[in-house]
């Protein structure tokens, strides 16, 4: 997948989308996280299953929050690549994930996100996001 497509503005907006994804999840701003997805957006992972549409994504935020058990999560996104075709884009990146509680790392995971993005009302959003686990770090 080449990452040299689209305008500079598109490229920066997509990078910002990825940063906001991590920031909103890690800081428990789930309503803002939901707004990063299209109305028919989906999220899928081995651990949490597949969640589709606004109601499904809202359910995911509750399940995810409860899974933390008070721990602080950190999503570190790297190696972002994407190809833009008009108002759609295919993208992938690496995820380094950890969560800590009482000063100790309780979980550390390495994964790959595979995404379909769509521009809606002038903003890039996730149409679908799939988490592909590499294993435990």
Predicted regions and their residues:
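Short, conserved clusters of charged catalytic residues that mark active-site
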Residues: 16-17, 77, 112
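Beta-strand elements of well-folded, non-transmembrane domains
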Residues: 95-101, 119
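Short helix-to-loop capping/linker segments positioned immediately adjacent to catalytic or ligand/cofactor-binding
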Residues: 5, 22-23, 67-70, 102
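Outer-membrane beta-barrel domain signature
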Residues: 37, 43, 100, 136-137
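Short, low-complexity N-terminal intrinsically disordered segments enriched in polar/charged residues
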Residues: 1-27, 31-35
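Short beta-strand edge/turn micro-motifs at domain boundaries
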Residues: 90, 110-137
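A solvent-exposed, acidic/Ser-Thr-rich amphipathic alpha-helical stretch
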Residues: 30-95
């Amino acid at each position: 997948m080449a990452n040299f497509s689209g305008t500079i503005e598109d490229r920066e907006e997509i990078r910002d989308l990825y940063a906001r994804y991590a920031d909103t999840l890690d800081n428990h701003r789930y309503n803002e996280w939901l707004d990063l997805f299209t109305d028919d957006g989906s999220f899928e992972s081995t651990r949490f299953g597949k969640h589709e549409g606004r109601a499904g994504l809202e359910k995911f935020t509750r399940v995810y929050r409860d899974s933390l058990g008070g721990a602080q999560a950190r999503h570190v996104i790297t190696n972002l690549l994407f190809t833009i075709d008009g108002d759609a884009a295919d993208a992938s990146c690496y995820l380094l994930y950890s969560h800590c509680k009482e000063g100790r790392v309780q979980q550390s995971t390495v994964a790959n996100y595979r995404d379909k993005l769509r521009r809606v009302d002038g903003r890039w959003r996730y149409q679908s996001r799939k988490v592909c686990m590499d294993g435990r770090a």
